[in-house]
Amino acid sequence: MTKNNDVLMAKKIRESLEIIEESYEFLLTYGAQGRKHETDDKGPSKIRESLRLFENALEKIQDIDLSVYANNISDFNKRFLDDLKVVRSILKSLLELPVITSDMIDNTNGLIVIRSVMTSLFFIDQVFLPKR
């Protein structure tokens, strides 16, 4: 891969990371709201939009190859991409439900695989990607 492609891939990852981070922050807030329904007296929630954005952003980086940034990273890269696929399936499953409650999202937020992907993304950004 050329240096220009490396920079483009880093930009793609960082753009996705920004969307993922915003979506995850919304999930944390929603999980703490105690909603039994997506719509309440304040109007409809944006939970489905947030889940879609999260899943779409993960899809955009589902084929990244970190070996362009570091040697001996293949095991980490494989594990990260496997976890990413699991998180995508969780988000898709939630979107298929007729109602998404705060408790469902709170439990989703607590899943180790969700935290693993989030932490791995921050690690990738700080350690492997070219400096901003």
Question: What positions do the PLM features span?
Answer:
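Short, well-structured alpha-helical interface segments that form or flank functional binding sites
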Residues: 8-11, 15-22, 49, 56, ...
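Amphipathic alpha-helical binding modules
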Residues: 87-132
